């Protein structure tokens, strides 16, 4: 794989603390930092694309993107290549204590659009109303009473609960199957780029075993994510 060339990288623009714009208008996030570090290690210049999962997936399909840090495009898409996991997350439900739970008929459950959790929510709670949107949109709906429960991965969930707005909410004690409890998150690489996949896996392994990945994650998380 030639060094010194541009690497077209896609990230979600609406998923704090993984990728988001802070109050000062600066791009931040664990995945953003990791992607920038990966480009540097590969000797490539990052060319960024931020958008919805649907937009990023189209970019991989049409060749305008080389890879995306959007493992929430599950189930895994046929023809794309996937790295080894760079973190593990678990699903959780967030709601108001004493409020309507997800197993109650007519419960409104918010789920990040395009994620594997949409399918699982429909399977777990067939009588519920599933509402999809960005993380920011769903959090606003939860705060305003537009949804009863937020079904989300715990990285984004705990980040919200630690904010002032999250103080009136809590994690709901809901049992899940083993696959939902722990999910490995991967970089998706466009079809045919086995050389790029091998390089990504090599650098992710170095970051993991050297402790650099853990040190970087401490900027956003207070617990081990791998």
Model-identified regions with their sequence ranges:
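Short loop->beta-strand "edge-of-pocket" segments that line small-molecule binding or catalytic clefts
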Residues: 4-13, 100-119, 130
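Short glycine-rich His-centered loop
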Residues: 4-29
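Periplasmic-binding protein-like
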Residues: 13, 87-92, 162-205, 221-226
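Short amphipathic alpha-helical coupling segments at ligand-binding clamshell hinges
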Residues: 30, 34, 104-108, 192-206, ...
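Acidic, polar ligand-binding/catalytic clefts
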Residues: 32, 36, 40, 45-105, ...
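Ligand-binding clefts/hinges and TM-proximal coupling segments of bilobed small-molecule sensing domains
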Residues: 120-137, 169-173, 204-226
